[in-house]
């Protein structure tokens, strides 16, 4: 799904909605005899089966909605009532009835005969160019049906004008662009924005035609139903695309990681060795120039490009960002809990300054033997307001911190230990 030549393109064939989902519309009244043959050559278009989003290098239509010409060729090749009925039965899903053409045959005759002369201003030439484009597609089917080509071109332009003037057009456009943005490379996303900036020109192109044809058609429930179903279809398609990209991108990254681990276990060399942990800007520019030089080239063993292309780099960067976002969302609560626990322990480990000053004063006054008795500890508990466990821990940590800085206390402790050991050995001898 890529974006090419400054227009939104997407090859979508939506086969979800078939003819069996919607009951056939009521049959239109028979047309007058003088126009029956004329309108059989241009059967009513079916919205969902023929409104395909396709790319065209020579056509810059914004929505790329085209009416297929295969059904027109089939219907025009035979003038029998049975073939016309078969073509109408094949296009039952959301097909537009041609009864409004029969009810307004005088207006239609003037519109078809004069082209789109009623449209004034600069939009006249643009719509006529659109009609010429539509007519050019039908010339290769055998030719000779100029009136039918004019009707089809008029219907194409008018259908687009109705879509652009519909209240759900903005939602339809947003859903379509959202589908395009999912798998479009990062370096091509600005093209979509540039095309969206030109949407006002497309609206202005068909606004005059919509105003001219406003009196021909009243409330169109079929168009409302089509727009509603199509917006829902695009939203569902967007969710499927997102799931596809996330799942398969995760699988691809995990597969690459497993391959790297296997290579590291076989060779004993990590992927970062020999290339440096980081690269400067000059090295980045050199790599980009090398990539431009060797893009599309195969190495000696035929394992593909020597250096990843720009599209591959953008895809890897996109996957990396998606994984980073997923990891943050998955482990956000745990990370917050761990951080709060660490901060709480830090706050709990630090005693207030006034209490530590009292303990340090007692430590300095008893530096030769910094081991408080139970009476000293009880008095310190009353003076500082701390718990007995906190005072014991503070003295233990303080003795560890000053173990080598107070040789007198260590000497006294060693002598006391020796004397205690001598007394115990003497008792054992005389026992």
Curated annotation (Swiss-Prot):
**Domain ELK: from-to ranges:** 322-342
Q: Name one GO biological process term.
A: detection of cytokinin stimulus
Cellular compartment(s): Nucleus
Q: Where is the composition biased (Polar residues)?
A: 404-413
Region of interest (Disordered), ranges = 15-47, 402-431
Compositionally biased, Pro residues: which spans? Answer: 22-34
The residues that make up the annotated DNA-binding region are 343-406
Query: What Gene Ontology molecular function terms does this protein carry?
Result: DNA binding; DNA-binding transcription factor activity
What superkingdom does the record give? Eukaryota
Classification via InterPro entries: ELK_dom, HD, Homeodomain-like_sf, KN_HD, KNOX1, KNOX2, TALE_homeobox
Q: Per its UniProt record, what PROSITE patterns does this chain match? A: ELK, HOMEOBOX_1, HOMEOBOX_2
Q: Which UniProt keywords apply?
A: DNA-binding, Homeobox, Nucleus
Q: Which GO terms describe its cellular component?
A: cytosol; nucleus
Quaternary assembly: May form heterodimeric complex with the TALE/BELL proteins. Interacts with OFP1, OFP2, OFP4, OFP12 and OFP14. Interacts with KNATM-B.
Give the record's family classification.
Answer: Belongs to the TALE/KNOX homeobox family.
Write down what this protein is called: Homeobox protein knotted-1-like 3
For this protein's source organism, the top of the classification is: Eukaryota, Viridiplantae, Streptophyta, Embryophyta, Tracheophyta
**Name of the coding gene:** KNAT3
């Amino acid at each position: 799904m890529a974006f090419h030549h400054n227009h939104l393109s997407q090859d979508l064939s939506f086969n979800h909605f078939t003819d069996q989902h919607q009951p056939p519309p009521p049959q239109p009244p028979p047309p007058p005899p003088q126009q029956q043959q004329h309108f059989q050559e241009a059967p009513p278009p079916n919205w969902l089966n023929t409104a395909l989003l396709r790319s065209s290098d020579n056509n810059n239509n914004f929505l790329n909605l085209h009416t297929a010409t295969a059904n027109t060729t089939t219907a025009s090749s035979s003038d029998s009532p049975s073939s016309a009925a078969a073509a109408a039965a094949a296009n039952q899903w959301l097909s537009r009835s041609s009864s409004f053409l029969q009810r307004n045959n005088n207006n239609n005759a003037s519109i078809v005969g004069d082209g789109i002369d009623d449209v004034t201003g600069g939009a006249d030439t643009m719509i006529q160019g659109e009609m010429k484009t539509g007519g050019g597609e039908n010339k290769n089917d055998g030719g000779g049906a100029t009136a039918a080509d004019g009707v089809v071109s008029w219907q194409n332009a008018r259908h687009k004008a109705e879509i652009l003037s519909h209240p759900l057009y903005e939602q339809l456009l947003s859903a379509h662009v959202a589908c395009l943005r999912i798998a479009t490379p990062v370096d091509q996303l600005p093209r979509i924005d540039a095309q969206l900036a030109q949407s006002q020109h497309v609206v202005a192109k068909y606004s005059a035609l919509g105003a001219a044809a406003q009196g021909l058609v009243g409330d169109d429930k079929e168009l409302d139903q089509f727009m509603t179903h199509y917006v829902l279809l695009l939203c569902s398609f967007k969710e499927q695309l997102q799931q596809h990209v996330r799942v398969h991108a995760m699988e691809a990254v995990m597969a690459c990681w497993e391959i790297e681990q296997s290579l590291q276990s076989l060779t004993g060399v990590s992927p970062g060795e020999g290339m440096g942990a980081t690269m400067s800007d000059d090295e980045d520019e050199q790599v980009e120039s090398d990539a431009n030089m060797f893009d599309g080239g195969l190495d000696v063993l035929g394992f593909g490009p020597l250096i990843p292309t720009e599209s591959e780099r953008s895809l890897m960067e996109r996957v990396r960002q998606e994984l980073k976002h997923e990891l943050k969302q998955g482990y956000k609560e745990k990370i917050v809990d761990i951080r709060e626990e660490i901060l709480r322990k830090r706050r709990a480990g630090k005693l207030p300054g006034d209490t530590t000053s009292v303990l340090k004063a007692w430590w300095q006054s008893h530096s030769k033997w910094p081991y408080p008795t139970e009476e000293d500890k009880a008095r310190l508990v009353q003076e500082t307001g701390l718990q007995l466990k906190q005072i014991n821990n503070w003295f233990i940590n303080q003795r560890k911190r000053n173990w080598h800085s107070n040789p007198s206390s260590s000497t006294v402790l060693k002598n006391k230990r020796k004397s205690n050991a001598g007394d115990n050995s003497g008792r054992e001898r005389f026992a």
